[in-house]
């Protein structure tokens, strides 16, 4: 299973938070297992996500694609700058990037 497929399976079968702001809010609470960021996420959001993820000891993966491509991988008709996987469901994404 490749990374894109792992993300899609997690979105379809698990519990995933989409969006930079909601991801940061959950990171502040220490919730989540993996953060996935788009390659073109704004630098200020990237720094915030990396900071709060480090405090919560949650790994961060930077997706090769843009936010448009990450949204498409998630099966959404909008851009996704970042997402937080709380429960991967049937996906093996945590093993792939961890």
UniProtKB/Swiss-Prot annotation:
Keywords for this protein: Ribonucleoprotein, Ribosomal protein
Residues making up the signal peptide according to the UniProt record: none
Gene Ontology process terms (BP): translation
PROSITE patterns (UniProt xref): RIBOSOMAL_L30E_1, RIBOSOMAL_L30E_2
SUPFAM superfamilies: L30e-like
GO molecular function terms listed in the Swiss-Prot or TrEMBL record: RNA binding; structural constituent of ribosome
GO CC term (a single one): cytosolic large ribosomal subunit
Pfam families: Ribosomal_L7Ae
Record-stated family: Belongs to the eukaryotic ribosomal protein eL30 family.
Protein name: Large ribosomal subunit protein eL30
Species in which this protein is naturally found: Methanothermobacter thermautotrophicus (strain ATCC 29096 / DSM 1053 / JCM 10044 / NBRC 100330 / Delta H) (Methanobacterium thermoautotrophicum)
Upper classification of the organism: Archaea, Methanobacteriati, Methanobacteriota, Methanomada group, Methanobacteria
